Amino acid sequence: MKAIQKVMGIIYAVSVMSLLIVSYASSAANVHETPTIKTIDRWVQEVSNWGRWGDADESGTLNLITPEKRVAAARLVTAGISVSLGHYAMTEKTVDNNSPYEHSMITLNLPGAENSRFDSIKVESHGSAHTHVDALCHQLKAGELYNGYSADVITDSGCAKLGIDNLKDGVFTRGILIDVPRLKGVPWLEPGVAIYPEDLEAWEKQASIRVGAGDVLLVRTGRWARRAAKGPWPMSERSS
């Protein structure tokens, strides 16, 4: 298998992956210190995209996926194989799945439509088990959402701004798989093991590829392989 698999098609970021913890390295021989709240606040300011695409923008860095980027991505297709990023529906309640997927079938016998079948599906998208995409209205910073939108746009009926409907046309771009366990020569990363910028850079070097603007990064941690071997993922403070 090639070191990098370019996944083409409708690509969604999969937040069910293990938390990607990115921290700057200290100057002391590859020693990483836990960042303080003050440091994180500084990073937020340094990488902020607020206002970059106008005060009314609701798409964030999806703006980097231009028509030209999509055309360039389409030209990379060779095998034409579709690869799903969705995880199977988990129906068992466990420590890493507090809200199991529920599916039920209903059979109705109506005149002229005997044995008609319908189904009902219930899924709580947020959590640590179900594949989902977090909208930009998911998190606030000091009472504000992305681009300075007020928290008032969020109500019990949904988000008037920054909702997931901004992705209604899908995400089509170049996908880059970064297989961190393979890089480190292990089957999976254990809970609490962080991924640092130098890990991503090492994968770029090993795979002879360079991440560019508008790319989607698919970072493999091996969480599901570990779960299959050792059971439910421990939802501790540093292993979400």
Where does each model-flagged region fall?
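Accessible peptide chain termini
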Residues: 1-2, 47
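Active-/binding-site microenvironments in catalytic and ligand-binding cores
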Residues: 26-240
